[in-house]
């Protein structure tokens, strides 16, 4: 833990720090006693000094004032080896992390310490992870679309530049792969700076993402300053305190690029549910009474303190894309339900589509966006999206009849609707760049104009004579024709 505070705070020498000692340890929670009149503030960072030089210091964050000159703090790392009576130093500031261009290409933990074995970070700029949201007068309310190159997203639930997007899905439906593809596409198309916050997810996925970024050139190990992303990890094997605060560490780094460098920044958080889950663990350890489904009573407040800082100002923007695990595929669970209120667009991943092998498994009817309005996206985009949704909705309504009576019992119009809906469903699948090594198919970036053209042609009946499998895992509509010709040639040679 760095004891030099950020530019927002006055520097005080170590001799003037308030000192206390541990009186109780309950797992990752410590009770610390201080002298009268020397109590630390809520959210201050405390450092437990190791008794020997080789012992690492443990950083904690003050969560409660207990009275009798005692505070309760949550540790950001393992508390193994700590004992009652050990000395604790109040740093006088919240946890402060390095910010600026020197963070690009590096991997950090919740304390802002590099964990990539590439040496210390060359910067004197530190910033506290607890800050207020920007005032209303500084906010930027302009509306513009953020093209991702993913057909189903750009057409039916477009993302807002400087907005917040949620990727909702249960276990194993493709949230992390979709986030990795978005990082890849956006870095290539826009060349902007990104910050990735790995909150309580698998260490293997964090390693895969790092390797993928090195291969694609998003991280340049020869010239780190030319890298486009900073990575902040608090994985699922870490204490709840680290998982609860790692999202704020990533956000603090993104805020610096927005406020000081005046850049447009992308903030990826995987997974926002783990942030809530860690808060629930900490809340129980602090002795608070749980609320609905066992979540912390402060769920809305904690979510708001993170989400309200993710916004666009007149200096720059933060566009946030957050994966949201949905427990038992229940969207009414308090964790995803609380997240919904803060989002501009929701991309819902469907297990039934994943079971059909349609990837990305984005549910075109459940996914929504406040940007899908004719005055924002234009009449052609809006009308095409509505016609696609109407066709898919009618197909969904007819599925029970098809399951019981079969396709032959439908009217000619309904049979045509079902055929076109199945082609659209498959056309909205897409090979991903980050999944090339698994699928063997090269990834495709499809412009919004091409997506609209393709769906318009399918709906108008231009491809009614082609089999639906030719629409599966292609990029533009022109590739469908090429695929159909290849299949005809194969059948002819047989």
From Swiss-Prot:
It comes from Cuscuta sandwichiana (Kauna'oa). SUPFAM superfamilies: C-terminal domain of alpha and beta subunits of F1 ATP synthase, N-terminal domain of alpha and beta subunits of F1 ATP synthase, P-loop containing nucleoside triphosphate hydrolases. It is an enzyme of class 7 (translocase). GO terms for molecular function: ATP binding; ATP hydrolysis activity; proton-transporting ATP synthase activity, rotational mechanism. This is ATP synthase subunit beta, plastid. Keywords: ATP synthesis, ATP-binding, CF(1), Hydrogen ion transport, Ion transport, Membrane, Nucleotide-binding, Plastid, Translocase, Transport. GO terms for biological process: proton motive force-driven mitochondrial ATP synthesis. Belongs to the ATPase alpha/beta chains family. Transmembrane segments: none annotated. Produces ATP from ADP in the presence of a proton gradient across the membrane. The catalytic sites are hosted primarily by the beta subunits. Pfam families: ATP-synt_ab, ATP-synt_ab_N, ATP-synt_VA_C. HAMAP family: ATP_synth_beta_bact (MF_01347). The keyword Hydrolase does not apply. The gene is atpB. It is a peripheral membrane protein. PROSITE patterns: ATPASE_ALPHA_BETA. Its EC number is 7.1.2.2. ATP binds at residues 169-176. CDD domains: ATP-synt_F1_beta_C, ATP-synt_F1_beta_N, F1-ATPase_beta_CD. F-type ATPases have 2 components, CF(1) - the catalytic core - and CF(0) - the membrane proton channel. CF(1) has five subunits: alpha(3), beta(3), gamma(1), delta(1), epsilon(1). CF(0) has four main subunits: a(1), b(1), b'(1) and c(9-12).
């Amino acid at each position: 833990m760095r004891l030099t505070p950020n530019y927002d705070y006055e520097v005080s020498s170590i001799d003037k720090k308030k000192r206390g000692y541990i009186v109780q340890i309950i797992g990752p929670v410590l009770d610390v006693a201080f002298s009268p009149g020397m109590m630390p503030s809520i959210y201050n960072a405390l450092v437990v000094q190791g008794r020997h030089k080789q012992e690492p210091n443990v950083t904690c964050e003050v969560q409660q004032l207990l009275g009798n000159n005692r505070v309760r703090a949550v540790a950001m790392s393992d508390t193994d080896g700590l004992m009652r009576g050990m000395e604790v130093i109040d740093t006088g500031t919240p946890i402060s992390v390095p910010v600026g261009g020197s963070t690009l290409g590096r991997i950090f933990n919740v304390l802002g310490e590099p964990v990539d074995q590439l040496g210390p970070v060359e910067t004197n700029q530190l910033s506290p992870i607890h800050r207020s949201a920007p005032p209303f007068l500084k906010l930027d309310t302009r509306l513009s679309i953020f093209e991702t190159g993913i057909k189903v997203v750009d057409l039916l639930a477009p993302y807002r530049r400087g907005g917040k997007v949620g990727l909702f899905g249960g276990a194993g439906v493709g949230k992390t792969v979709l986030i990795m593809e978005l990082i890849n596409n956006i870095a290539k198309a826009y060349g902007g700076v990104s910050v990735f916050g790995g909150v309580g997810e698998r260490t293997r996925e964090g390693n895969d993402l790092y390797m993928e970024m090195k291969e694609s050139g998003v991280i340049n190990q020869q010239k780190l300053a030319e890298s486009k992303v900073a990575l902040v990890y608090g994985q699922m094997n870490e204490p709840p305190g680290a998982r609860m605060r790692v999202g704020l560490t990533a956000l603090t780094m993104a805020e610096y690029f927005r406020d000081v460098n005046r850049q447009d920044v992308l903030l990826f958080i995987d997974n926002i549910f783990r942030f809530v889950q860690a808060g629930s663990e900490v809340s129980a350890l602090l002795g608070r009474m749980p609320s609905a489904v066992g979540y912390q009573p402060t769920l809305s407040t904690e979510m708001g303190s993170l989400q309200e800082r993710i916004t666009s100002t007149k200096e720059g923007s933060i566009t946030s894309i957050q994966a949201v695990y949905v427990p038992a595929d229940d969207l009414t669970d308090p964790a995803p339900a609380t997240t919904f209120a803060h989002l501009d667009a929701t991309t819902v991943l469907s297990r039934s589509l994943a079971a059909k092998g349609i990837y990305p498994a984005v549910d075109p009817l459940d996914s929504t966006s406040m940007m899908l309005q004719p005055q924002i996206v234009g009449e052609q985009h809006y009308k095409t999206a509505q016609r696609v949704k109407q066709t898919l909705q009618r197909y969904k309504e007819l599925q029970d009849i098809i399951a019981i009576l079969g396709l032959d019992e439908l009217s000619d119009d309904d049979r045509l609707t079902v055929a076109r809906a199945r082609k659209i469903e498959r056309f909205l699948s897409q090979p991903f760049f980050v999944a090339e090594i698994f699928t063997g198919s090269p990834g495709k970036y499809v412009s919004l104009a091409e997506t609209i053209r393709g769906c318009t042609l399918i709906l108008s009946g231009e491809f009614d004579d082609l089999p639906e499998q030719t629409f599966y895992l292609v990029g533009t509509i022109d590739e469908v024709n090429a695929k159909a010709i290849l299949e005809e040639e194969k059948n002819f040679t047989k």
